[in-house]
Amino acid sequence: MRTRFRRSMVRRAAFTGISMVLLQVGAGAEGMYGPFSEYAMSQESEIALAKSAAPGSISTHATIEVLTPRGYEVAVKGDRDFICMVLRGWSAAPDPVDTRSAKIRGPICFDSVGARTVVPAEELKAKLGLAGKSPEEIGHQVALQYGLGKLPKIEGAAFAYMWSASQRIGPDAGAWHPHMMVYVPYYENRFLGNNPVGNHTAPFAVGEGTPYCIVMIAVDDRLAIRAGER
């Protein structure tokens, strides 16, 4: 069980780790994502799940984006700069085949920097996935758009909450520990002491040394939030 969650956590890190896209473009299996109907949720359920990613002091003031047949669209306009949304499997493109399950749900809330610099990439990946692009095509297009300067670069450090206890990080896995994701360009795991990837007792870096490195910091399991609970 511990090994399965460690592997699933690493896959989930790639949901918003553009570094994983750049490292794996051209790799892996073939196949398209399913139609929108396989990823759809009721708006009420998706809003509740998105909000479960962060404490109420943040999520109640955040803008909430939900998935539609056209991609992510604003369902609730917040009064702060946070954006909360529920990521789907294409956020990990072009990662391993099991991240392509339509069952995957990754609630996440981005701070103002992440809202400006990470969310646009997630919105693009959703549109490409819904347009029938393969995981490899999505990875290529995202990398290309970054290279052309059409997607914004991460400014300094961006923070994201992933505290939901209702997340689903793989077809046969549930939630990992609630944690923070810190987007720190060019950071390296050795700066943290080379902690093992998937370790919930110490921070570790995913996509280290790239412009899109993420430091994962697990928090107390008692902070996990179930959708609809506050």
Residue ranges and their predicted role:
Residues M1-R11:
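N-terminal secretory signal peptides that target proteins for export/translocation
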Residues A27:
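An N-terminal RHG(E/S)-centered segment typical of histidine phosphatases
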Residues E30-R230:
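Primary mode marks residue(s) on the alpha4-beta5-alpha5 output face of response regulator receiver
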Residues A13-Q24:
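Bacterial N-terminal signal peptides
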